[in-house]
Every structure is written in C-alpha cells, then in structure tokens.
Amino acid sequence: MGKMVSLNMALKVRGINKAAFEEKLNMFLNDEHSAVDKSLVEEKELKGDVIVKGVLPCPLKIPILEAFDKFIEDQKNNGLDIGYELKSANLGIDWIESDINSKDIDKVADIMISAGFELFFDKEKFSEFFKNESFYVEPREFNKDFDNEKICLKDPKNIYDIIAVVPCVFLVNENNLNGKEIPTSWEELLFSGNYNDSVAIPLSDLDMFNALVVTIFSKWGVEGIKALAKVYKKSLHPAEMVKKKGDSKNNPIVSVTPYFFTQMVSRSSALKVVWPKDGAIVSPVFLMTKKDNEKAKTVVEFFKNSSVGKILSSNGKFPTTVKGVDNLLEDNNGFLFCGWDYIH
C-alpha cells in the first residue's frame, strides 16, 4: 500500500499546503547551516564577548550567515569572540522569548534581531528593560529611501534600529476581475466596497500579517480592521499565491504578498504585481543592542556596512536602510509605516 501513496496524496491527507511544503523543503535542502541546527537535541549554550540572537526573513538567512561567519573569523583574529544563533523567521521566536521572560538582562543576548513586530513590542515583557534603559542604538545616517519628507524609519528614542524591510504589495488575478478595476491603493482595496470577500491574506506568515494589522490600525483605526475583515476571502501562503491561475471563483482577485515572492510570477501569467500608490506596507527587520556592552558596537557595524546592505536589499526585494545602497526602487515605490509615535 505504501508504494501507492504519492507525496502529493500524503500532503492532502495531512492537510499540508503543497506549495508551502515545497518551499520549506527546498530551504532545508539548500541550507548548509541546517545540518548543525537539526542535529542538536538541546539549545546550544552560546559563549563569547558578544552574543547575537535573532530571526531573519527566510531568503536572507543563508547569505547573511555566510558573510557573518567570515566576519566572526576576522574578529576572532582581532581578539573578539562572537557567539550567535540566527534562525529563519518561520521557525518562530519562542527560543528567544525564554531569555526575555527571565526578566534578567544578563540572560538576554547583546544583540537581538527580529523580522516583524512579534518579538520586541510586548510591554509586559520589556517594561523593566525599558525602565532601566537597557537598550540603545547609536544614531546613524539612513538610506534616503527611508529618511525623507514622506517616511522616516529612524527611532527618535534610539531604542530600535531598522536594518531592512519586507514590503507588502498586491498580486492581482486579472482573469477574476469581472469588470472591476485593478486596485491601486490600500484605501481603494479596503474601502471602495469592490473587493469584499475577494482578498487572500497570508495568515500563517505572522511577520507580514502582524505588519498588516498594526499598520492598517495605526492609519485607519478599528474601521480599517473591519474593512480588512470584509475583503478577506482566504488564507494563502505567498508561495501558493504566485501559482494561482485561471478564473476559478475560488481564486481571490487580490493576494496580499511580500514583494519578494512576486519575483516568481511568470511574465505570461494573468497575475499582475501592483505596488500600492499609498505605499507598500512594511514589516521591518528590527535590531536592538544592550547599552552596557561596548564590544557589541563592532558587531552592530557589520549590519550597517554597504556590503551587508546589498545582501539585505537583494536588488530591492528587501530594501535596506543602509546608507549608499541602491535599492533599485522606482520613483513611485513608496512605503507605509505605522510610525514611531504609534510604536512608542
């Protein structure tokens, strides 16, 4: 019987999305660091002058770690020992939260990185640390794409740093429009009434989903959240969104997806990529640094240099705040950020 069961059949029986499974399998097979991660039964105890922990958007993990490993070796020759654990964002943050829940700043990593709003914004968990002013980032010049008259990603309180963003855009199935106009903005998508029960949202992608909810609420309040609920049709993983074809009534008109995944869309596809004219909602990649470790500054500088900025940007797929890096954006590629007043 086992010989007659295909992988596709097994996934259907288990209720596992095929596209999402393929993506995770490919990441596992291509991740040279995964052999180490999977072999450990217990979390390894990190040692060093500077400890770095965090999560990165999945496509960024391998290239960042390759550059970081080389940096660590170079710093070891200079007498600086760095211990780190950086995982893919889809693996969750429970393993970092246990350090924070201890309320002991000595158990918290010197540098923490988080993709999205999931980790650093629980007032109950961080209140004591903020009260004691445990975190501080040195002010720096930002890339002009993120420091201009329309947007500023510099934290005025110098608690958080943002090193890159994951932009969220529309993927419109032109075969399903049925006479409707292609939505060109979040305001039109949410409030025109033309797209009720027509939009796919990646509920399982917490980084993106949290960014959607936080940003929409910060701009339009409860009415914005109600509007989001009205347009919602189904949850699709971004990898599945780019494969949707045809004019099936079960297919959404619009899929809200990270910009990175739109690079997988075929030119001959009926799927049209739309960068909202009121800005792509961003899920920031945040960095926090403990104030009392001077040696951590050297490591923070790694994430701010132009070579790493180019890796983060990935030719504009994950635009970076690092000064001098060309994010290869069009003039009309703006961003929508919840704002520091809202965060603080």
What is the meaning of each model-derived region?
Residues 40-44, 101-103, 109-113, 136-169:
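A structural signal for short loop-to-beta-strand junctions that line the ligand-binding cleft
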Residues 170-176, 282-295, 311-312, 321:
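A bilobed periplasmic-binding-protein/Venus flytrap-type ligand-binding module shared by bacterial periplasmic
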Residues 44-47, 294, 301-344:
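Extracellular/periplasmic juxtamembrane helices and adjacent flexible linkers that interface
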Residues 33-123:
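Early extracytoplasmic/lumenal segment of secretory-pathway proteins
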Residues 179-194:
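Flexible hinge/capping segments at coil-to-helix
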Residues 200-204, 208-275:
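Ligand-binding pocket segment of bilobal, Venus flytrap-like solute-binding proteins
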Residues 53-59, 131-141, 155-162, 172-175, 196-215, 267-281, ...:
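Short beta-strand->loop
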